A protein has these predicted regions:
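N-terminal glycine-rich cofactor-binding segment that shapes the pocket for flavin-like pterin cofactors
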Residues: 71, 84-124, 129
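Carbohydrate-binding/catalytic loop surfaces
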Residues: 6-25, 74-104, 137-155, 193
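Extended ligand-binding clefts on enzyme/binding-domain cores
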Residues: 133, 154-193
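Low-complexity, Ser/Thr/Pro/Gly-enriched N-terminal "stalk/linker" regions
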Residues: 1-79, 113-121, 125-129, 133-136
């Protein structure tokens, strides 16, 4: 009943505004920023820098606050979104694990609003949708970049285990911690570790 949901409109018939995050760093969600922001967080804590803490919190909060729109944008217009294209089109741990793990760490130390919806979104992907071998070990089966297909990468441990451990603490659900531990057994069995 009524008009479908929209986000931003101009005062003109059938005219909509689609936000675009042109910034290469602030408000972006990606693997390298997850690693970098994690380091910055613990640096800020160690040196007592409120400026760095505020920057990190604002960055992560912007990602949380715009995810709902980004998912709507993808559904409404199709294809990659102009905001959070990796998070709305997850096909690997690269797209979600590092940043989501850092997000939970930021929440632990600085507090974030609505972090649960994003944590659950990523947790659902990793636990229920990420490709796995028969014993549950993460595996790259069919991905956007074909050279990844049918491969196993040791860095998938980094992109999964810290998130799963923090998510287990966040939710209080032991199954995520068990999954994290089992990843080490599966990777050790197959890789030179």
């Amino acid at each position: 009943v009524g008009e479908p949901a929209t986000y931003w409109r101009l005062d003109a018939p059938d005219t909509f505004v689609r936000p675009y995050n042109e910034n290469t760093l602030f408000g972006r969600w990606n693997y390298p920023l997850g690693v970098t922001m994690y380091g910055l967080l613990h640096t800020a804590i160690a040196i007592g820098s409120e400026d760095i803490k505020n920057y990190i919190k604002d960055h992560v909060q912007l990602c949380i606050d715009t995810l709902e729109y980004a998912l709507w944008d993808k559904e409404q217009y199709g294809g990659a979104t102009s905001i959070h294209n990796l998070l709305t089109s997850i096909d690997s741990l690269d797209d979600c694990g590092s940043f989501a793990s850092m997000m939970l760490e930021v929440n632990k130390y600085l507090g974030l609003r609505d972090v649960k919806k994003v944590a659950d979104y990523v947790g659902d992907y990793i636990y229920n949708h990420q490709s796995r071998l028969e014993d549950g070990t993460f595996f790259r089966k069919e991905m956007m970049h074909h050279f990844h297909n049918m491969t196993m990468w040791a860095d998938d441990l980094y992109m999964s285990v810290p998130f799963l451990v923090r998510y287990s603490q966040f939710t209080g659900d032991q199954k995520y911690l068990d999954d994290a531990a089992n990843q080490f057994f599966g990777f050790k069995k197959r890789l030179f570790m």
